[in-house]
Amino acid sequence: MAAGKARIGHLAPGFTAKAVMPDGQFKDISMSDYRGKYVVFFFYPLDFTFVCPTEIIAFSDAAEEFRKIGCEVIGASVDSHFCHLAWTNTPRKHGGLGAMKIPLVADTMRSISTDYGVFEGGMRASPTGGLFIIDDKGVLRQITINDLPVGRCVDEILRLVQAFQFTDKHGEVCPAGWKPGSDTIKPDVQKSKDFFSKQQ
């Protein structure tokens, strides 16, 4: 599967861009800064919208859970870093983000969202809700792109990262709905019977 220049099993498109950091400062960050860690990189259409703050706040609130497993979360939209800062300075009860624990990238030139296949131009002036899981070697492992009215599930994203990390470490594969501690499958015709023999 591919989205723009982003292709499963290949290095994720690199970038350097201005971001609002958790301390409220502006900083240029690059995807290469995160090599050695897993990354959840998600796009949302615009600041000061409706579903977006619920997603971003949920990712921010879960940032420590991701960090515990060696994963960083980065959000991005086509708004400026000044707009991002204004949104983080707006109270949540007024539709703002409040204090953030994750960086928000300003893709004002739309080059990053184009490379990741979530910005197509035309009538839609903002990116779709794309989410990308990138492993510690910088390789793209998962792509999800959805329309805007429905928010994403942070718990499911955390589960997917844990599953990819498990397969990387142990060489076994994870069945549907796998969670840490549950059974996995040895990718071998004979050895896989250990798993399937337990099924009802």
UniProtKB/Swiss-Prot annotation:
Its EC number is 1.11.1.24. Residues 6-166 form the Thioredoxin domain. It holds the Pfam family AhpC-TSA. InterPro entries: AhpC/TSA, Peroxiredoxin, Peroxiredoxin_AhpC-typ, Peroxiredoxin_C, Thioredoxin-like_sf, Thioredoxin_domain. GO terms for cellular component: cytosol. Keywords: Antioxidant, Disulfide bond, Oxidoreductase, Peroxidase, Redox-active center. The active site is at 52 (cysteine sulfenic acid (-soh) intermediate). It is an enzyme of class 1 (oxidoreductase). SUPFAM superfamilies: Thioredoxin-like (SSF52833). One of its GO terms (biological process) is hydrogen peroxide catabolic process. It catalyses: a hydroperoxide + [thioredoxin]-dithiol = an alcohol + [thioredoxin]-disulfide + H2O. GO terms for molecular function: thioredoxin peroxidase activity. Belongs to the peroxiredoxin family. AhpC/Prx1 subfamily. The active site is a conserved redox-active cysteine residue, the peroxidatic cysteine (C(P)), which makes the nucleophilic attack on the peroxide substrate. The peroxide oxidizes the C(P)-SH to cysteine sulfenic acid (C(P)-SOH), which then reacts with another cysteine residue, the resolving cysteine (C(R)), to form a disulfide bridge. The disulfide is subsequently reduced by an appropriate electron donor to complete the catalytic cycle. In this typical 2-Cys peroxiredoxin, C(R) is provided by the other dimeric subunit to form an intersubunit disulfide. Homodimer; disulfide-linked, upon oxidation. Thiol-specific peroxidase that catalyzes the reduction of hydrogen peroxide and organic hydroperoxides to water and alcohols, respectively. Plays a role in cell protection against oxidative stress by detoxifying peroxides and as sensor of hydrogen peroxide-mediated signaling events. This is Peroxiredoxin. It comes from Oncorhynchus mykiss (Rainbow trout).
